[in-house]
């Protein structure tokens, strides 16, 4: 499997303390710092490679968007990161089904629950 150029997952809850601890463990990241209304930023580092991190609270239907802007993460894909986040943070996590191509349904996502249950869902963008 080819590594994703970046990682984006959606968290049903944004427990900042737990999220900061997880990002620190996985990416050697400093705690997230406020970066505007409902936005938080930090940077992680793996093997000397810097990883910009952006959290946007309530990005989509109340879910927070966590974006890791680098291919140099511990996870090859959004799905792998979503599984790790759901297990560690104890919340529902959603992500794309894979690399998006023209003609793909943009509303299809993978839902990962804290107990490891996964399913494909329709998640249309409501604009909220």
Walk through the language-model features, giving the residues of each.
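Acidic, proline/glycine-rich low-complexity IDRs
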Residues: 83-84, 88-128
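Short, surface-exposed coil-to-beta transition loops
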Residues: 49-52, 78-79, 104-107
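Short, intrinsically disordered low-complexity segments
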Residues: 31-75
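Long, charged/polar, surface-exposed segments that mediate recognition or autoinhibition
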Residues: 71-78, 82-87
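A general secondary-structure signal for short beta-strands and their flanking turns/coil
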Residues: 2-6, 61-63, 86
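Short, extreme N-terminal segment that most often corresponds to the first beta-strand
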Residues: 1-22
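A common structural junction motif
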Residues: 24-32, 88-92
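Short amphipathic alpha-helices in soluble, non-transmembrane regions
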Residues: 18-28, 81-84
């Amino acid at each position: 499997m080819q590594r994703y150029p970046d990682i984006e997952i959606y968290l049903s809850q944004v427990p900042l303390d737990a999220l900061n601890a997880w990002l620190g463990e996985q990416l050697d990241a400093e705690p997230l710092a406020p970066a505007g209304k409902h936005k938080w930023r930090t940077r992680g580092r793996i093997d000397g490679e810097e990883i910009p991190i952006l959290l946007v609270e309530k990005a989509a239907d109340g879910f927070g968007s966590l974006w890791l802007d680098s291919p140099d993460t511990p996870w090859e894909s959004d799905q792998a990161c979503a599984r790790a986040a759901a297990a560690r943070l104890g919340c529902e996590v959603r992500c794309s089904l894979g690399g998006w191509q023209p003609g793909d349904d943009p509303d299809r996502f993978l839902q990962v629950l804290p107990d490891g249950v996964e399913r494909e869902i329709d998640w249309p963008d409501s604009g909220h």
